[in-house]
Amino acid sequence: GYLYHPAYYYGAGASTQFKNQDAIGNYNFGYNEGHATGGTFRREFGDALGNVKVGSYGLTDADGRRRVVTYKADASGFNANVHTNEPGTDSSKDPANTLVNKAVLPTTYYGGYYPGHYYGHYAPYHYGYY
């Protein structure tokens, strides 16, 4: 049989978001949204002092193009790693502090990329905006 999902059937899409912070200020937040023409996501984890931020963000188009950027920002600066199957990208010409991996990625969208383990609870939808 067929699985009926009204949000996808009408093209409205679906989204989730979360935001957490512990008593000393360590935090994580993110969102994931998908619809008939693709989707986007973002995740970030950081320490209470602002010394380290680790995260990822990305997008997927309906035609199978996909870009996922993982990053780390610390005392050494901002360093990103870009994974994409987009046409026209040349991995031999990386921008400063960025590594572009022009690898064949799956064309099926399975949701966001998680750069690590998530410990905690998702915040209800009505919790603030990012």
From Swiss-Prot:
GO terms for molecular function: structural constituent of chitin-based larval cuticle. The lineage of its organism: Eukaryota, Metazoa, Ecdysozoa, Arthropoda, Chelicerata. GO terms for cellular component: chitin-based extracellular matrix. The keyword Phosphoprotein does not apply. Keywords: Cuticle. This is Cuticle protein 14 isoform a. InterPro entries: CHIT_BIND_RR_consensus, Cuticle_Struct_Prot, Insect_cuticle. It comes from the Eukaryota. Pfam families: Chitin_bind_4. Residues 24-90 form the Chitin-binding type R&R domain. PROSITE patterns: CHIT_BIND_RR_1 (PS00233), CHIT_BIND_RR_2 (PS51155).
